[in-house]
Amino acid sequence: GIFMQTHGDVERVLNVGAPNDITKFMGNLKFDIKPTMNSEQITELAQDLKLNGARMIAAASTHKGEDEIILDAFKQLKKEFCDIKLLLAPRHPERYEKVEQLIAQTGFAYGKRSNNDTFENNDIIMLDTMGELMKMFSVCHFAYIGGSFSSTGGHNPLEANIWGKPVVSGECVFNFKDIYEFLTRSDAAKLSATPEELTNDMRRLLADNDFYNKACADTSK
């Protein structure tokens, strides 16, 4: 059999002569992610991070050039929403040092997950440990999915959506085009054309509770 991820792919292979009877739509296996923690573990993680009711924005898998965009947005939004915190998770460990410098330049109090720093006295935590990002989505308010304001093509938004969290991204998401096409039909995901638009999209998720609750509900559709 010929198994394709999207209906568009099925059409394309049929157009170039693939036999109809063996060409099947399989769907995207990346839709099959499941949450790995129960509500007790999620509460425990929030306590471990000492979030104390703060709303944490998770900036996930950021690439070169994106950290500045996120830090700038956070700086603007922090003036309006004093209860927000930022978890910044660079995609590549070799960039940790550079990203730490960028964070330090903002003047915000910050810590590092590798030092077991918490949000108790910090506005920003850099996630510089491996294998923890997935569970961090469970305690975020919403997530920015990186690789989408660089030429990388984005990362998987479902990793945040499965926890019921909406996502914001830049428009460069060709790696997950079909997933984003599906998610952006509702408010589960929003693609922003510019850093300014991204800041506004983030602002709406913080300022408009009805919109935020709808966006959260849309993630499970």
Regions found by a protein language model. Give the residues of each.
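Nucleotide-activated sugar donor-binding and catalytic core shared by glycosyltransferases
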Residues: 1-221
